[in-house]
Amino acid sequence: MAPSLTETLVRTAIARAVQNVFATMLRRDTTPRPAAAPPAAGATRTFQLLASVGFVGEANGVVYLCLQDDMSRFVTREVLGLSPDDPTASDPEVVRDAVGEIANMTVGGFKNQLCDAGLPCMLTLPTIVRGNDLKVITLKGADRHVVEFECAGHILVADIQLKAG
């Protein structure tokens, strides 16, 4: 019987994945913020960029990395080693590529920890959506886990929705 997808397993796995990727790619520390209740139905928290990567197998679901514009530009600058005033960090294609790589690596690390816990699964391709007032809604039948991280004064939200396979 496959292990259960507990809140502790999910929070620990995403925290390790985010911390490892940010330390390696951005050379920055991240700090998980205290656990908060998932947003209520109809909640109005919005973002300008959503990066999602799904996974299928003994665990099925999707991880959304949710960023405001300031965080997406910060990630792009740090990953590419750009100066704070370099306009390249605001180029939509450059931001998409940088954040997409961070999302793929982060969810890959998360998936590896699920595999290590006895829940083998594989990743889907990353998807990046950019716009105004973007929201993540709960998928039908999925358990939702929302974990916020702080990095250099910026906030990253990992919105994880999953089901046991």
Description of each model-found segment:
Residues 1-165:
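N-terminal auxiliary interaction/assembly segments of multi-subunit proteins
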